[in-house]
Amino acid sequence: MKFLDLAKVYIRSGAGGNGCVSFRREKFIEYGGPDGGDGGKGGSVWAEAVDGLNTLIDFRYQQHFFAKNGQSGMGRQRSGKDGDEIVLRVPVGTEILDEDEETVLADLTHVGERVLLAKGGNGGFGNLHFKSSTNQAPRRANSGQEGVERTIWLRLKLIADAGLLGLPNAGKSTFLSSTSNARPKIADYPFTTLHPNLGVVGIDNTEFVMADIPGLIEGAHEGRGIGDRFLGHVERCAVLLHLVDGTSETVAEDYRTIINELEAYGGELASKPRVTALNKIDALDDEERAEARAALEAEVGAPVLMMSSVSREGLDLVLRAVRAEIDDDRLRIKQAEASEEEDTPWQP
């Protein structure tokens, strides 16, 4: 299935049905009075996060979603039928943006979560509603309320515990395939990975989800290479695993390139916890390892882990470091939720 993480959608809720002007007509009843029914409500447009979807590709082939109008009222106090609503089924992790692509209308992060995008119009009143002591035979009825028409954007941000970062050919896909059941495309050329991949990684009888995104290059925030739009898929991650190619002659510059792109992207991505690892050490001798590690640690300003996805050397240490950061993040979230509950005043 093709991957699509951004889609433009046109939606319109249904208009309400018109009220009816009608009078009771029965034998031997000379003054039957009004009996016009109300119009039905127009259908609303909803979005719902569902399980089993991981792409917005369906919205490439259908961009217009129009709910049904409510039917008009009828005589004998019969109300019109309500219009059928429409539900947009989206993957978990979908953000719904206004037409400006900046204003976030909703963020669906749980299965079954729903949000109302466009409310259907109310039905008009029939003439029965306008009967009074001074007007026993009203000949007026309300028109139905118009529906709401708008343009929205759907943007998918995959939900993972950890995200993989690095230049093209840093070994991210090989790492994911070595540590999980994911089978991303692997080849010895840049930009082998063209869309994000998810894998469930296990270590010490615990599991977490890791996302592999296409590699970044210098100037990605300006659209070079594949660009930086896939960085949105690691915004929700608790920790970022930054892989640096140990066979490169410029490991420090490679590391700085990715950090600069994170800072240019903005948001909280640059300040997220990071684990930095020097990859492909199976291709280096002891002297080359020490030299590359020293250069990278001087740039990072912190200890750097050594690993190889092929020989699996140091792999468990890297996974344990990532897992520790995930546990710390979950603990911080629980503490924040507990403090919010304490600050909430008691209500009877």
UniProtKB/Swiss-Prot annotation:
It comes from the Bacteria. One of its GO terms (biological process) is ribosome biogenesis. It is found in: Cytoplasm. The keyword Nucleotide-binding applies. Its main location: cytoplasm. InterPro entries: G_OBG, GTP-bd, GTP-bd_Obg/CgtA, GTP1-OBG_CS, GTP1_OBG_dom, GTP1_OBG_dom_sf, OBG_GTPase, P-loop_NTPase. Mg(2+) binds at residues 173, 193. Its EC number is 3.6.5.-. Its cofactor is Mg(2+). Residues 1-159 form the Obg domain. The keyword Transmembrane helix does not apply. GO terms for molecular function: GTP binding; GTPase activity; magnesium ion binding. Residues 160-327 form the OBG-type G domain. GO terms for cellular component: cytoplasm. It is an enzyme of class 3 (hydrolase). Belongs to the TRAFAC class OBG-HflX-like GTPase superfamily. OBG GTPase family. Monomer. This is GTPase Obg. The lineage of its organism: Bacteria, Pseudomonadati, Pseudomonadota, Alphaproteobacteria, Rhodobacterales. The gene is obg.
